[in-house]
Amino acid sequence: MTNLTLDVNIIDFPSIPVAMLPHRCRPELLNYSVAKFIMWRKETGLSPVNQSQTFGVAWDDPATTAPEAFRFDICGSVSEPIPDNRYGVSNGELTGGRYAVARHVGELDDISHTIWGIIRHWLPASGEKMRKAPILFHYTNLAEGVTEQRLETNVYVPLA
């Protein structure tokens, strides 16, 4: 992990309309759902990666959730409604509100360090409380040629 210290900010996150592909399966199979979402994006052009924001919605902690109960949504911002399609991508919305946000730099396999840094260290010291809502990931530099070690992901922890 390349995050040695966390720079955490509190923001008011706006609600964002998204194209959403739910992943309801083992965490190890998440990349298959991601590939499906990428194919949908390329085929339809409705949420192009170079013009739209890309998000992950983490409903569950893969370390503590039974594999068959794991839930994660793959999302891309959109400006128009999503028609029915063979990929299972549908209309959704990311819930707005107050969030603590910190940047994770590096491999996504290590993102739990950033999440737990916010929850276990920053949150108690800040006096803030976590709201019952999923954690959001905003993948800020997805592009051809970006190595995993250089990925930048904003981690949003919902606040009460």
UniProtKB/Swiss-Prot annotation:
InterPro entries: AraC_E-bd (IPR010499), DNA_gyrase_inhibitor (IPR050908), GyrI-like (IPR029442), Reg_factor_effector_dom_sf (IPR011256)
Keywords: Repressor, Transcription, Transcription regulation
Gene3D superfamilies: Regulatory factor, effector binding domain
SUPFAM superfamilies per record: Probable bacterial effector-binding domain
S-S bonds: none
Function, in words: Represses expression of mcbR.
The protein's name: Probable transcriptional regulator YgiV
Organism: Escherichia coli O157:H7
